[in-house]
Amino acid sequence: MPKFDVSKRDLERLVGKEFTVEEWEDLFLYAKCELDDVWEENGEIYFKADSKDTNRPDLWSAEGIARQIRWALGFRRGLPEYEVEKSDVTVYVDEKLKDIRPYGVYAIVECLKLDEEALKQMINLQEKVALTFGRRRREVAIGIFDFDKVKPPIYYRAAEKTEKFVPLGFEEELTLEEILEKHEKGREYGHLIKDKPYYPLLVDSEGKVLSMPPIINSETTGRVTTETRNVFVDVTGWDLNKVMLALNVVVTALAERGGRIKSVKVVYPDFEIETPNLTPKSFEVELDYIRKLAGLDLSDGEIKDLLERMMYDVTLEDGKAKLLYPAFRDDIMHARDVLEDVLIAYGYNEIEPEEPKLAVQGRGDKFIEFEDAVRELMVGFGLQEVMTFNLTNREAQYGKMNLEYGRDYFNNPPAELVEIENPISPKWSALRNWLLPSLLDFLSQNTHEEYPQRLFEVGKATLIDESRETKTVSESKLAVVLAQPRVTFTDTKEILDSVMRHLGFEYELEEVEHPSFIPGRVGKVIVKGKAIGVIGEIHPSVLEKWGIEMPVAGFELFLRPLYTEPYL
Protein backbone atom coordinates (compact mmCIF):
# COMPACT_ATOMS: atom_id res chain seq x y z
CA MET A 1 0.00 0.00 0.00
CA PRO A 2 1.28 3.52 -0.77
CA LYS A 3 2.93 5.40 2.09
CA PHE A 4 3.92 9.06 1.90
CA ASP A 5 4.93 11.98 4.12
CA VAL A 6 2.77 15.07 4.65
CA SER A 7 3.30 18.22 6.69
CA LYS A 8 0.73 18.98 9.40
CA ARG A 9 1.00 22.68 8.61
CA ASP A 10 0.48 22.09 4.89
CA LEU A 11 -2.54 19.85 5.48
CA GLU A 12 -4.13 22.42 7.77
CA ARG A 13 -3.48 25.17 5.24
CA LEU A 14 -5.33 23.12 2.61
CA VAL A 15 -8.19 22.10 4.93
CA GLY A 16 -8.54 25.60 6.37
CA LYS A 17 -8.50 24.58 10.03
CA GLU A 18 -6.00 23.44 12.67
CA PHE A 19 -6.30 20.16 14.57
CA THR A 20 -4.38 18.30 17.26
CA VAL A 21 -2.29 15.26 16.34
CA GLU A 22 -4.87 13.06 18.09
CA GLU A 23 -7.65 14.58 15.97
CA TRP A 24 -5.62 13.99 12.82
CA GLU A 25 -5.41 10.30 13.69
CA ASP A 26 -9.19 10.07 13.28
CA LEU A 27 -9.40 12.47 10.33
CA PHE A 28 -7.07 10.36 8.21
CA LEU A 29 -9.69 7.59 8.25
CA TYR A 30 -11.97 9.74 6.07
CA ALA A 31 -9.27 9.53 3.38
CA LYS A 32 -8.87 5.73 3.75
CA CYS A 33 -5.48 6.26 5.40
CA GLU A 34 -3.93 5.43 8.74
CA LEU A 35 -1.46 7.61 10.62
CA ASP A 36 1.62 5.41 10.55
CA ASP A 37 4.12 7.75 12.22
CA VAL A 38 4.53 11.28 13.60
CA TRP A 39 7.79 13.20 13.96
CA GLU A 40 9.15 16.72 14.26
CA GLU A 41 11.74 18.18 11.90
CA ASN A 42 13.05 21.76 12.00
CA GLY A 43 10.20 22.77 14.26
CA GLU A 44 7.53 21.32 11.95
CA ILE A 45 5.34 18.24 12.53
CA TYR A 46 5.18 15.58 9.82
CA PHE A 47 2.89 12.57 9.36
CA LYS A 48 3.55 9.27 7.62
CA ALA A 49 0.26 8.48 5.85
CA ASP A 50 -0.43 4.83 5.04
CA SER A 51 -3.10 4.55 2.34
CA LYS A 52 -5.32 1.48 2.61
CA ASP A 53 -6.77 1.67 -0.90
CA THR A 54 -4.79 1.02 -4.08
CA ASN A 55 -7.80 2.12 -6.18
CA ARG A 56 -7.84 5.72 -4.93
CA PRO A 57 -4.72 7.50 -6.28
CA ASP A 58 -6.51 10.81 -5.70
CA LEU A 59 -5.89 10.24 -1.96
CA TRP A 60 -2.11 9.77 -2.23
CA SER A 61 -1.10 13.36 -1.54
CA ALA A 62 -1.72 16.19 0.91
CA GLU A 63 -4.09 17.83 -1.60
CA GLY A 64 -6.26 14.72 -1.93
CA ILE A 65 -6.37 14.03 1.80
CA ALA A 66 -7.22 17.65 2.62
CA ARG A 67 -9.94 17.76 -0.04
CA GLN A 68 -11.54 14.57 1.28
CA ILE A 69 -11.48 15.88 4.85
CA ARG A 70 -12.97 19.28 3.89
CA TRP A 71 -15.94 17.48 2.39
CA ALA A 72 -16.25 14.85 5.15
CA LEU A 73 -16.40 17.58 7.81
CA GLY A 74 -19.07 19.41 5.85
CA PHE A 75 -16.94 22.46 4.94
CA ARG A 76 -17.91 21.69 1.34
CA ARG A 77 -20.67 19.45 -0.05
CA GLY A 78 -21.54 17.73 -3.29
CA LEU A 79 -19.46 17.39 -6.41
CA PRO A 80 -16.16 19.31 -6.55
CA GLU A 81 -16.13 21.68 -9.50
CA TYR A 82 -13.05 22.35 -11.61
CA GLU A 83 -13.14 24.74 -14.52
CA VAL A 84 -11.18 23.65 -17.58
CA GLU A 85 -10.28 26.41 -20.03
CA LYS A 86 -9.51 25.55 -23.62
CA SER A 87 -5.96 26.30 -24.77
CA ASP A 88 -4.60 26.54 -28.31
CA VAL A 89 -1.95 23.88 -27.60
CA THR A 90 -1.88 20.69 -29.68
CA VAL A 91 0.09 17.47 -29.21
CA TYR A 92 0.57 15.18 -32.21
CA VAL A 93 1.03 11.44 -31.53
CA ASP A 94 3.23 9.40 -33.88
CA GLU A 95 1.66 6.28 -35.44
CA LYS A 96 4.95 4.40 -34.92
CA LEU A 97 4.32 4.44 -31.16
CA LYS A 98 1.34 2.09 -31.53
CA ASP A 99 3.31 -0.98 -30.39
CA ILE A 100 5.80 0.93 -28.22
CA ARG A 101 3.81 3.17 -25.87
CA PRO A 102 0.68 4.22 -27.73
CA TYR A 103 -1.20 6.70 -25.55
CA GLY A 104 -0.32 10.13 -24.26
CA VAL A 105 -2.67 12.65 -22.63
CA TYR A 106 -1.80 16.18 -21.57
CA ALA A 107 -2.86 19.30 -19.68
CA ILE A 108 -1.60 22.75 -18.71
CA VAL A 109 -1.91 24.14 -15.18
CA GLU A 110 -1.21 27.86 -14.82
CA CYS A 111 -0.82 30.39 -12.00
CA LEU A 112 0.73 27.99 -9.50
CA LYS A 113 2.41 29.24 -6.34
CA LEU A 114 4.64 26.41 -5.20
CA ASP A 115 6.55 26.43 -1.93
CA GLU A 116 8.89 23.59 -0.96
CA GLU A 117 6.12 21.49 0.59
CA ALA A 118 3.81 21.91 -2.40
CA LEU A 119 6.66 20.97 -4.73
CA LYS A 120 7.44 17.91 -2.61
CA GLN A 121 3.79 16.79 -2.73
CA MET A 122 3.62 17.24 -6.51
CA ILE A 123 6.69 15.05 -7.02
CA ASN A 124 5.42 12.50 -4.46
CA LEU A 125 2.05 12.19 -6.20
CA GLN A 126 3.72 11.83 -9.58
CA GLU A 127 5.94 9.01 -8.28
CA LYS A 128 3.30 7.17 -6.21
CA VAL A 129 0.75 7.11 -9.02
CA ALA A 130 3.32 5.81 -11.52
CA LEU A 131 4.74 3.27 -9.06
CA THR A 132 1.55 1.74 -7.67
CA PHE A 133 -1.38 2.61 -9.95
CA GLY A 134 0.95 2.61 -12.97
CA ARG A 135 2.68 -0.67 -12.02
CA ARG A 136 6.19 0.75 -11.89
CA ARG A 137 5.60 2.98 -14.93
CA ARG A 138 4.58 0.07 -17.14
CA GLU A 139 0.93 1.18 -17.32
CA VAL A 140 1.31 4.86 -16.38
CA ALA A 141 4.25 7.27 -16.37
CA ILE A 142 3.90 10.98 -15.56
CA GLY A 143 6.00 13.98 -16.52
CA ILE A 144 5.62 17.56 -15.28
CA PHE A 145 7.45 20.39 -17.09
CA ASP A 146 8.03 24.13 -16.89
CA PHE A 147 5.58 25.22 -19.60
CA ASP A 148 7.21 28.63 -19.99
CA LYS A 149 10.22 26.84 -21.52
CA VAL A 150 8.12 24.92 -24.06
CA LYS A 151 7.10 26.16 -27.52
CA PRO A 152 3.97 24.40 -28.89
CA PRO A 153 2.89 22.50 -30.87
CA ILE A 154 4.31 19.43 -29.17
CA TYR A 155 5.11 16.06 -30.71
CA TYR A 156 5.01 12.65 -29.03
CA ARG A 157 7.06 10.69 -31.53
CA ALA A 158 9.16 7.60 -32.15
CA ALA A 159 12.88 8.45 -32.09
CA GLU A 160 16.03 6.75 -33.29
CA LYS A 161 18.12 5.36 -30.45
CA THR A 162 21.05 7.59 -31.48
CA GLU A 163 19.18 10.86 -30.82
CA LYS A 164 20.54 12.92 -27.93
CA PHE A 165 19.40 15.21 -25.12
CA VAL A 166 20.51 16.20 -21.61
CA PRO A 167 18.59 14.03 -19.11
CA LEU A 168 17.48 15.43 -15.75
CA GLY A 169 20.38 15.56 -13.31
CA PHE A 170 23.09 15.45 -16.01
CA GLU A 171 25.14 18.19 -17.62
CA GLU A 172 26.07 16.52 -20.91
CA GLU A 173 24.04 15.10 -23.76
CA LEU A 174 23.54 11.34 -23.96
CA THR A 175 22.07 9.19 -26.71
CA LEU A 176 18.81 7.47 -25.84
CA GLU A 177 20.67 4.15 -25.61
CA GLU A 178 23.26 5.71 -23.28
CA ILE A 179 20.50 7.03 -21.02
CA LEU A 180 19.27 3.46 -20.48
CA GLU A 181 22.80 2.40 -19.53
CA LYS A 182 24.14 5.39 -17.57
CA HIS A 183 21.18 7.14 -15.95
CA GLU A 184 19.78 5.73 -12.70
CA LYS A 185 16.20 5.85 -14.04
CA GLY A 186 17.34 4.34 -17.32
CA ARG A 187 18.77 1.32 -15.53
CA GLU A 188 15.65 1.03 -13.35
CA TYR A 189 13.00 1.36 -16.06
CA GLY A 190 14.88 0.72 -19.30
CA HIS A 191 13.46 -2.80 -19.63
CA LEU A 192 10.07 -1.24 -20.48
CA ILE A 193 11.31 -0.02 -23.88
CA LYS A 194 14.78 -1.52 -24.37
CA ASP A 195 13.73 -4.09 -26.99
CA LYS A 196 11.57 -1.69 -29.01
CA PRO A 197 12.70 -0.55 -32.51
CA TYR A 198 12.30 3.10 -31.51
CA TYR A 199 12.17 4.98 -28.22
CA PRO A 200 9.42 7.49 -27.32
CA LEU A 201 10.30 11.19 -27.16
CA LEU A 202 8.22 14.24 -26.29
CA VAL A 203 9.55 17.32 -28.12
CA ASP A 204 8.34 20.86 -28.82
CA SER A 205 8.16 22.72 -32.14
CA GLU A 206 11.81 23.79 -31.82
CA GLY A 207 12.95 20.19 -31.39
CA LYS A 208 13.61 20.74 -27.69
CA VAL A 209 13.19 17.46 -25.76
CA LEU A 210 10.75 17.48 -22.85
CA SER A 211 11.10 13.83 -21.89
CA MET A 212 11.79 10.25 -22.86
CA PRO A 213 8.69 8.46 -21.52
CA PRO A 214 8.60 6.44 -19.34
CA ILE A 215 12.24 6.94 -18.34
CA ILE A 216 13.31 10.53 -17.58
CA ASN A 217 12.57 14.22 -18.19
CA SER A 218 15.09 16.52 -19.82
CA GLU A 219 17.21 18.91 -17.77
CA THR A 220 16.04 21.77 -20.02
CA THR A 221 12.29 21.68 -19.36
CA GLY A 222 11.82 18.89 -16.82
CA ARG A 223 13.14 20.65 -13.72
CA VAL A 224 10.24 22.27 -11.85
CA THR A 225 11.11 24.61 -8.94
CA THR A 226 9.33 26.93 -6.53
CA GLU A 227 9.82 29.64 -9.18
CA THR A 228 7.76 27.70 -11.73
CA ARG A 229 4.32 29.21 -12.31
CA ASN A 230 2.94 27.27 -15.29
CA VAL A 231 3.36 23.53 -15.84
CA PHE A 232 2.70 21.11 -18.69
CA VAL A 233 1.60 17.64 -17.55
CA ASP A 234 2.01 14.52 -19.68
CA VAL A 235 0.86 10.99 -18.91
CA THR A 236 1.76 8.05 -21.16
CA GLY A 237 0.86 4.38 -21.11
CA TRP A 238 -0.93 1.47 -22.74
CA ASP A 239 -4.53 2.06 -21.65
CA LEU A 240 -6.26 5.32 -22.60
CA ASN A 241 -8.74 5.14 -19.70
CA LYS A 242 -5.95 4.59 -17.19
CA VAL A 243 -3.75 7.46 -18.41
CA MET A 244 -6.79 9.77 -18.50
CA LEU A 245 -7.57 8.93 -14.87
CA ALA A 246 -3.97 9.57 -13.79
CA LEU A 247 -4.03 12.94 -15.58
CA ASN A 248 -7.27 13.87 -13.81
CA VAL A 249 -5.72 12.99 -10.43
CA VAL A 250 -2.65 15.17 -11.01
CA VAL A 251 -4.35 18.25 -12.46
CA THR A 252 -7.10 18.37 -9.83
CA ALA A 253 -4.46 18.08 -7.09
CA LEU A 254 -2.62 21.05 -8.62
CA ALA A 255 -5.94 22.91 -8.83
CA GLU A 256 -6.25 22.49 -5.05
CA ARG A 257 -3.09 24.65 -4.89
CA GLY A 258 -4.83 27.40 -6.85
CA GLY A 259 -3.81 26.30 -10.34
CA ARG A 260 -5.94 27.03 -13.41
CA ILE A 261 -6.47 23.97 -15.62
CA LYS A 262 -6.26 24.30 -19.40
CA SER A 263 -7.00 21.54 -21.88
CA VAL A 264 -4.79 20.30 -24.72
CA LYS A 265 -5.90 18.86 -28.05
CA VAL A 266 -4.28 15.46 -28.68
CA VAL A 267 -4.22 14.32 -32.31
CA TYR A 268 -3.79 10.58 -32.91
CA PRO A 269 -3.44 9.02 -36.39
CA ASP A 270 -7.11 7.97 -36.43
CA PHE A 271 -8.86 10.18 -33.84
CA GLU A 272 -8.39 13.23 -31.64
CA ILE A 273 -9.41 14.11 -28.09
CA GLU A 274 -9.33 17.06 -25.71
CA THR A 275 -7.69 16.36 -22.34
CA PRO A 276 -8.20 16.41 -19.43
CA ASN A 277 -11.85 15.37 -19.39
CA LEU A 278 -13.28 16.21 -15.96
CA THR A 279 -16.89 15.38 -16.84
CA PRO A 280 -18.46 13.76 -13.74
CA LYS A 281 -19.26 10.04 -13.83
CA SER A 282 -22.67 8.61 -12.95
CA PHE A 283 -24.01 5.70 -10.92
CA GLU A 284 -27.35 4.62 -9.46
CA VAL A 285 -28.03 2.74 -6.23
CA GLU A 286 -31.10 1.44 -4.38
CA LEU A 287 -31.50 3.19 -1.02
CA ASP A 288 -32.91 0.05 0.62
CA TYR A 289 -29.79 -1.84 -0.47
CA ILE A 290 -27.65 0.71 1.39
CA ARG A 291 -29.80 0.41 4.52
CA LYS A 292 -29.86 -3.39 4.43
CA LEU A 293 -26.12 -3.93 4.03
CA ALA A 294 -25.17 -1.10 6.37
CA GLY A 295 -27.47 -2.46 9.07
CA LEU A 296 -28.42 1.14 9.87
CA ASP A 297 -31.86 2.74 9.97
CA LEU A 298 -30.96 5.70 7.77
CA SER A 299 -33.55 7.96 6.20
CA ASP A 300 -33.32 8.93 2.54
CA GLY A 301 -32.19 12.40 3.58
CA GLU A 302 -29.47 11.01 5.86
CA ILE A 303 -28.06 8.87 3.05
CA LYS A 304 -28.10 11.90 0.75
CA ASP A 305 -26.28 13.98 3.37
CA LEU A 306 -23.60 11.32 3.92
CA LEU A 307 -22.99 10.94 0.18
CA GLU A 308 -22.75 14.69 -0.37
CA ARG A 309 -20.02 14.71 2.28
CA MET A 310 -18.16 12.14 0.15
CA MET A 311 -18.19 14.40 -2.96
CA TYR A 312 -21.31 13.06 -4.70
CA ASP A 313 -24.11 15.06 -6.27
CA VAL A 314 -27.26 13.17 -5.24
CA THR A 315 -30.76 13.13 -6.75
CA LEU A 316 -33.35 11.03 -4.89
CA GLU A 317 -36.02 9.46 -7.06
CA ASP A 318 -38.32 6.43 -6.62
CA GLY A 319 -36.28 4.86 -3.83
CA LYS A 320 -33.02 5.31 -5.69
CA ALA A 321 -30.07 7.68 -5.45
CA LYS A 322 -28.85 8.93 -8.81
CA LEU A 323 -25.23 9.92 -8.29
CA LEU A 324 -22.59 12.01 -9.99
CA TYR A 325 -19.03 11.58 -8.72
CA PRO A 326 -15.64 13.13 -9.62
CA ALA A 327 -13.68 12.23 -12.75
CA PHE A 328 -10.58 11.57 -10.62
CA ARG A 329 -12.27 8.42 -9.27
CA ASP A 330 -12.64 5.12 -11.11
CA ASP A 331 -13.44 2.78 -8.23
CA ILE A 332 -17.26 2.88 -8.23
CA MET A 333 -18.16 -0.43 -9.87
CA HIS A 334 -20.88 -1.78 -7.57
CA ALA A 335 -23.40 -0.51 -5.03
CA ARG A 336 -21.07 -1.83 -2.31
CA ASP A 337 -18.53 0.82 -3.32
CA VAL A 338 -21.14 3.50 -2.64
CA LEU A 339 -22.05 1.77 0.62
CA GLU A 340 -18.42 1.98 1.70
CA ASP A 341 -18.46 5.75 1.22
CA VAL A 342 -21.69 6.02 3.22
CA LEU A 343 -20.08 4.12 6.12
CA ILE A 344 -16.88 6.18 5.98
CA ALA A 345 -18.90 9.39 6.22
CA TYR A 346 -21.08 7.91 8.98
CA GLY A 347 -17.97 6.77 10.87
CA TYR A 348 -17.08 3.14 11.47
CA ASN A 349 -16.45 3.95 15.12
CA GLU A 350 -20.06 5.13 15.42
CA ILE A 351 -21.49 1.74 14.46
CA GLU A 352 -22.67 -0.25 17.48
CA PRO A 353 -21.14 -3.76 17.52
CA GLU A 354 -23.54 -6.70 17.71
CA GLU A 355 -22.87 -10.18 19.03
CA PRO A 356 -23.60 -13.04 16.61
CA LYS A 357 -27.07 -14.47 17.22
CA LEU A 358 -25.91 -18.02 16.44
CA ALA A 359 -23.41 -20.01 18.46
CA VAL A 360 -20.97 -21.16 15.81
CA GLN A 361 -17.46 -22.53 15.70
CA GLY A 362 -15.22 -21.70 12.79
CA ARG A 363 -12.47 -23.72 11.19
CA GLY A 364 -10.49 -23.57 8.01
CA ASP A 365 -11.94 -25.10 4.88
CA LYS A 366 -10.19 -28.43 4.38
CA PHE A 367 -9.55 -27.94 0.68
CA ILE A 368 -8.01 -24.51 1.33
CA GLU A 369 -5.79 -26.17 3.94
CA PHE A 370 -4.84 -28.66 1.22
CA GLU A 371 -3.96 -25.79 -1.14
CA ASP A 372 -1.79 -24.24 1.57
CA ALA A 373 -0.05 -27.57 2.08
CA VAL A 374 0.69 -27.74 -1.66
CA ARG A 375 2.16 -24.24 -1.45
CA GLU A 376 4.46 -25.30 1.39
CA LEU A 377 5.47 -28.32 -0.65
CA MET A 378 6.42 -26.18 -3.66
CA VAL A 379 8.41 -23.77 -1.50
CA GLY A 380 10.24 -26.80 -0.16
CA PHE A 381 11.26 -27.63 -3.73
CA GLY A 382 12.96 -24.22 -3.95
CA LEU A 383 10.25 -22.50 -6.00
CA GLN A 384 9.01 -18.95 -5.41
CA GLU A 385 5.28 -18.32 -5.17
CA VAL A 386 3.63 -15.59 -7.21
CA MET A 387 0.01 -14.46 -7.21
CA THR A 388 -1.19 -13.10 -10.53
CA PHE A 389 -4.47 -11.59 -11.65
CA ASN A 390 -7.54 -13.68 -12.48
CA LEU A 391 -8.54 -11.08 -15.06
CA THR A 392 -6.85 -11.38 -18.43
CA ASN A 393 -7.77 -11.29 -22.13
CA ARG A 394 -8.24 -13.67 -25.04
CA GLU A 395 -4.95 -12.71 -26.70
CA ALA A 396 -2.94 -13.60 -23.58
CA GLN A 397 -4.74 -16.91 -23.02
CA TYR A 398 -4.80 -18.06 -26.65
CA GLY A 399 -3.05 -15.81 -29.19
CA LYS A 400 0.25 -15.48 -27.38
CA MET A 401 0.14 -19.20 -26.54
CA ASN A 402 -0.15 -20.29 -30.24
CA LEU A 403 -3.67 -21.59 -29.55
CA GLU A 404 -6.81 -21.48 -31.65
CA TYR A 405 -9.79 -20.01 -29.79
CA GLY A 406 -12.73 -22.42 -29.84
CA ARG A 407 -10.61 -25.56 -29.73
CA ASP A 408 -10.33 -27.63 -26.55
CA TYR A 409 -6.84 -28.66 -25.44
CA PHE A 410 -7.98 -31.31 -22.91
CA ASN A 411 -9.08 -28.45 -20.60
CA ASN A 412 -5.57 -26.93 -20.61
CA PRO A 413 -7.06 -24.66 -21.74
CA PRO A 414 -10.70 -25.43 -22.63
CA ALA A 415 -12.25 -24.11 -25.84
CA GLU A 416 -13.68 -20.84 -24.53
CA LEU A 417 -13.22 -18.09 -21.97
CA VAL A 418 -15.68 -16.37 -19.68
CA GLU A 419 -15.51 -12.89 -21.20
CA ILE A 420 -16.71 -9.59 -19.74
CA GLU A 421 -19.38 -7.87 -21.80
CA ASN A 422 -18.34 -4.29 -20.98
CA PRO A 423 -14.72 -4.38 -19.76
CA ILE A 424 -13.13 -1.18 -18.44
CA SER A 425 -9.95 -2.15 -20.30
CA PRO A 426 -9.35 -4.62 -23.17
CA LYS A 427 -6.43 -5.95 -21.15
CA TRP A 428 -8.82 -7.12 -18.42
CA SER A 429 -11.66 -8.46 -20.56
CA ALA A 430 -11.90 -12.11 -19.48
CA LEU A 431 -11.40 -14.54 -16.61
CA ARG A 432 -8.44 -16.84 -17.14
CA ASN A 433 -9.10 -20.51 -17.79
CA TRP A 434 -5.50 -21.64 -17.24
CA LEU A 435 -2.53 -20.28 -15.30
CA LEU A 436 0.57 -20.78 -17.45
CA PRO A 437 -0.04 -17.59 -19.52
CA SER A 438 -0.16 -15.61 -16.26
CA LEU A 439 3.22 -17.00 -15.22
CA LEU A 440 4.70 -16.24 -18.65
CA ASP A 441 3.37 -12.69 -18.34
CA PHE A 442 5.12 -12.45 -14.97
CA LEU A 443 8.37 -13.72 -16.49
CA SER A 444 8.06 -11.20 -19.34
CA GLN A 445 7.92 -8.36 -16.83
CA ASN A 446 10.98 -9.59 -14.96
CA THR A 447 13.46 -10.28 -17.75
CA HIS A 448 15.78 -7.73 -16.12
CA GLU A 449 15.99 -9.84 -12.94
CA GLU A 450 18.54 -12.60 -12.26
CA TYR A 451 18.06 -16.17 -13.47
CA PRO A 452 17.15 -18.90 -12.77
CA GLN A 453 13.55 -17.90 -12.08
CA ARG A 454 11.64 -20.88 -10.64
CA LEU A 455 8.02 -19.92 -10.01
CA PHE A 456 4.72 -21.50 -9.05
CA GLU A 457 1.16 -20.39 -8.46
CA VAL A 458 -1.78 -22.05 -6.77
CA GLY A 459 -4.74 -20.12 -8.13
CA LYS A 460 -8.18 -20.15 -9.67
CA ALA A 461 -9.16 -20.78 -13.28
CA THR A 462 -12.73 -20.09 -14.38
CA LEU A 463 -14.32 -22.60 -16.76
CA ILE A 464 -17.69 -22.60 -18.52
CA ASP A 465 -20.09 -25.21 -17.09
CA GLU A 466 -23.64 -25.04 -18.48
CA SER A 467 -24.90 -27.47 -15.81
CA ARG A 468 -24.37 -24.95 -13.03
CA GLU A 469 -26.63 -22.07 -12.06
CA THR A 470 -23.89 -19.53 -12.76
CA LYS A 471 -22.86 -21.37 -15.97
CA THR A 472 -19.28 -21.33 -14.66
CA VAL A 473 -17.06 -23.23 -12.25
CA SER A 474 -13.94 -22.01 -10.47
CA GLU A 475 -11.21 -24.66 -10.46
CA SER A 476 -8.12 -24.68 -8.26
CA LYS A 477 -4.92 -25.28 -10.23
CA LEU A 478 -1.18 -25.57 -9.69
CA ALA A 479 1.16 -24.14 -12.32
CA VAL A 480 4.97 -24.23 -12.36
CA VAL A 481 7.51 -22.57 -14.67
CA LEU A 482 11.29 -22.92 -14.73
CA ALA A 483 13.14 -20.18 -16.63
CA GLN A 484 16.83 -20.93 -16.75
CA PRO A 485 19.64 -21.78 -19.20
CA ARG A 486 19.38 -25.28 -20.73
CA VAL A 487 16.15 -26.11 -18.90
CA THR A 488 14.63 -29.39 -20.11
CA PHE A 489 11.48 -31.47 -19.90
CA THR A 490 13.30 -33.65 -17.36
CA ASP A 491 13.88 -30.72 -14.98
CA THR A 492 10.15 -30.06 -14.83
CA LYS A 493 9.21 -33.73 -14.63
CA GLU A 494 11.41 -34.16 -11.54
CA ILE A 495 9.24 -31.61 -9.72
CA LEU A 496 6.05 -33.25 -11.01
CA ASP A 497 7.33 -36.64 -9.80
CA SER A 498 7.97 -35.21 -6.33
CA VAL A 499 4.53 -33.58 -6.17
CA MET A 500 2.76 -36.81 -7.09
CA ARG A 501 4.86 -38.87 -4.69
CA HIS A 502 4.11 -36.54 -1.76
CA LEU A 503 0.40 -36.47 -2.59
CA GLY A 504 0.31 -40.27 -2.89
CA PHE A 505 -0.68 -40.59 -6.55
CA GLU A 506 0.69 -42.54 -9.46
CA TYR A 507 0.42 -40.91 -12.85
CA GLU A 508 1.11 -41.52 -16.52
CA LEU A 509 2.33 -39.25 -19.29
CA GLU A 510 0.85 -39.48 -22.76
CA GLU A 511 2.59 -37.66 -25.62
CA VAL A 512 0.25 -35.14 -27.24
CA GLU A 513 0.27 -32.22 -29.63
CA HIS A 514 -0.11 -28.86 -27.93
CA PRO A 515 0.93 -25.71 -29.87
CA SER A 516 2.09 -23.94 -26.70
CA PHE A 517 4.87 -26.50 -26.28
CA ILE A 518 7.72 -27.92 -28.37
CA PRO A 519 6.54 -31.00 -30.36
CA GLY A 520 7.83 -34.21 -28.82
CA ARG A 521 8.49 -32.48 -25.51
CA VAL A 522 4.95 -32.18 -24.23
CA GLY A 523 2.73 -34.64 -22.43
CA LYS A 524 -0.73 -35.03 -20.97
CA VAL A 525 -0.73 -35.81 -17.22
CA ILE A 526 -3.13 -38.69 -16.50
CA VAL A 527 -4.31 -39.81 -13.04
CA LYS A 528 -6.76 -42.71 -12.67
CA GLY A 529 -7.44 -42.64 -16.40
CA LYS A 530 -8.33 -38.94 -16.47
CA ALA A 531 -6.30 -36.08 -17.95
CA ILE A 532 -5.64 -33.56 -15.17
CA GLY A 533 -2.83 -31.48 -16.63
CA VAL A 534 -0.11 -30.76 -19.15
CA ILE A 535 3.70 -30.66 -18.94
CA GLY A 536 6.36 -29.62 -21.42
CA GLU A 537 8.93 -27.19 -22.78
CA ILE A 538 7.39 -23.90 -23.90
CA HIS A 539 7.59 -23.33 -27.67
CA PRO A 540 10.18 -20.69 -28.73
CA SER A 541 7.56 -18.79 -30.75
CA VAL A 542 5.44 -18.46 -27.59
CA LEU A 543 8.43 -17.12 -25.67
CA GLU A 544 9.11 -14.66 -28.49
CA LYS A 545 5.55 -13.34 -28.29
CA TRP A 546 6.00 -12.74 -24.56
CA GLY A 547 9.43 -11.15 -25.05
CA ILE A 548 11.21 -13.90 -23.07
CA GLU A 549 14.68 -14.90 -24.28
CA MET A 550 15.39 -17.56 -21.64
CA PRO A 551 14.17 -21.17 -22.24
CA VAL A 552 11.13 -22.08 -20.14
CA ALA A 553 9.56 -25.40 -19.16
CA GLY A 554 6.56 -25.97 -16.93
CA PHE A 555 3.42 -27.85 -16.05
CA GLU A 556 -0.13 -27.19 -14.90
CA LEU A 557 -2.47 -29.45 -12.92
CA PHE A 558 -6.03 -29.45 -11.64
CA LEU A 559 -5.75 -29.84 -7.85
CA ARG A 560 -9.23 -31.12 -7.00
CA PRO A 561 -8.54 -34.65 -8.43
CA LEU A 562 -5.43 -34.83 -6.20
CA TYR A 563 -7.27 -33.93 -2.99
CA THR A 564 -7.63 -36.68 -0.41
CA GLU A 565 -7.82 -36.77 3.38
CA PRO A 566 -5.40 -37.04 5.04
CA TYR A 567 -3.00 -35.41 2.59
CA LEU A 568 0.77 -34.87 2.47
From Swiss-Prot:
It holds the Pfam family B5. One of its GO terms (molecular function) is phenylalanine-tRNA ligase activity. InterPro entries: aa-tRNA-synth_II/BPL/LPL (IPR045864), B3/B4_tRNA-bd (IPR005146), DNA-bd_dom_put_sf (IPR009061), Phe-tRNA-ligase_IIc_bsu (IPR045060), Phe-tRNA-synth_IIc_bsu_arc_euk (IPR004531), Phe-tRNA_synthase-like_B3/B4 (IPR020825), Phe_tRNA_ligase_beta2_arc (IPR022918), PheRS_beta_core (IPR041616). GO terms for cellular component: phenylalanine-tRNA ligase complex. The keyword ATP-binding applies. Its main location: cytoplasm. Mg(2+) binds at residues 331, 337, 340-341. It catalyses: tRNA(Phe) + L-phenylalanine + ATP = L-phenylalanyl-tRNA(Phe) + AMP + diphosphate + H(+). SUPFAM superfamilies: Class II aaRS and biotin synthetases, PheT/TilS domain, Putative DNA-binding domain. Belongs to the phenylalanyl-tRNA synthetase beta subunit family. Type 2 subfamily. This is Phenylalanine--tRNA ligase beta subunit. It comes from Thermococcus gammatolerans (strain DSM 15229 / JCM 11827 / EJ3). The lineage of its organism: Archaea, Methanobacteriati, Methanobacteriota, Thermococci, Thermococcales. The gene is pheT.
